[in-house]
Structure formats: C-alpha cells, structure tokens
C-alpha cells in the first residue's frame, strides 16, 4: 500500500507540473519523486515503455487468454482476439455474446457446470440410462463409454461414447441415420438438452441426467460426445478412445516391432515394402493384443 501511495503521489505531482518532463533527474526535483521513480521515467523517455509494466500487462493478458480458453469452443486464437477486444472476464464475455459462435455460446451458457468434474457414481447412472435408451431403440446397437471412466477413474471431464451397429461396416456407405436416431431418442428422454454439432458420424452436445424423486436438486449439465464407428472397426476404436495416451503410444510401438501398424480404425500387417496390407478381422480388444503378442490388459490396467 505504501508503494501504491508513493506512485500515486508522484503521478499527481508530475501531472500538475506545468513544463514537459525531459529526464528523471528533472523529475527528482519534484515532491514525491525518488530515485526509483526517476529511473523508471528515464526508461519511459528512452524506450517509450516500461519493461516491468509490459511484463505485468503480458501476465494479465495470458491469465485472461487462459480463462477464455476454459470456455468450451474457444481456442487460443479466438481467446486472444477476445482479449484484444478488451474482454478479459466471463462477466464481460456474457455481455458480448455477439462475438461468439453457436458452440462458444453453449460453452458460456454452461461454463460453471462444465468446469466441474463428473463423479463416478453420476457417470455410472449416465451409463445405465444411456444404454437403456439405446437398447429400447434397437437392442443390436452397442454403446461404450470410453475415456478415463472406462479405466476406472473416480471422476471424468465429459461423456465420450462409441456407438456401432452390426448393419454398419466400413464397406458400407455412411449411415448417419444410425447416429441421428440415437440422438433423437436421447433428446426425447430429456437427457440431451443442447446440440453443439451433429455430423454423419459424430455428435457433440450437452446432457443432464433426468432428476429422480429422491434427488434434492437437479444434476449439472455435462458435455457429451457420441461417435458412430463401423462394426469391423469398433474394437480398435474402443481400444484407442479408452486410452490412456501413453498406453496407446506404447501399444502402437509394440505393434510396429511385431510387424503391424495400429490406429483407431484397424490393425494391418506391414509388408516388406513398408506398405500396410489389408485390415485384420478384429472381434474384441483382446484380438489386437493377441495379434501383436502382448498380454491382455483390462481397461483399469491401462493407466500410464
């Protein structure tokens, strides 16, 4: 507080001085201007800026940019533009929603809820509810919640679902109606509340677990993604989207050592020319482990 008052007093004195200040030495003659402030005046006169102030401003800018990127849908470039436009807080952002696209508006609308992790008991309820709805629609569907939840995590950031149907394989034309039907079913059941985007094979949106009689308050709004994958690629997909990232990298490296190439779609043998062959049939995650000669690990054993 003492330093703040010292700067305030010096600024007031300089502002009232009738002549243009040309040096720190000249400024020191004024009441309240000491050696440190005089040096800063010399720096401003010589360079047009003050390094310490520039660092503070840069730090403030970075803090504001990091805050903006916490809003779902706002990336670093969009965040910097907002901050350059003078928007540095969530409150200010709410007053300037004309600068946001559809995705970003939904991210802002549910900002506080999306900041909170989803406890495992809630994830388990969501899984039970979603699977029941999908089975009611068509029992041939297969739906798996992947990510850290499948690895046994105590909490999750969002709900990431892989969906498939035996009538859909990679040899077929895309079948967006398979995804659309599930999304409509989840909307009808009041689980899905907002659509961020809906394409041929991926839905991004918002969901809220419907309240039950014993619930004291409504559940929070959560981010949900659903990916539709051909049945013949499903188990490579669940393996990949279950993770962890480090486990996936380790498994891909072991596949290469064994003469195969593995990604989120297929596992294929590598020929002597370095060109990958036809995808191998995969009917379970264990099939992939077996092909590359790796001991099977349950999802809960894949945290690295």
Q: What spans do the regions from the language model cover?
A:
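Accessory alpha-helical DNA-binding modules that contact the DNA backbone or grooves
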Residues: 4-159, 163-203, 235, 249, ...
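Non-catalytic peripheral regions of nucleotide-handling enzymes
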Residues: 206-207, 211-215, 226-304
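Phosphate/ribose-recognition catalytic cores of enzymes acting on nucleotide-derived substrates
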Residues: 221
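Intrinsically disordered, low-complexity domain-flanking/linker segments in eukaryotic proteins
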Residues: 170-175, 210-217
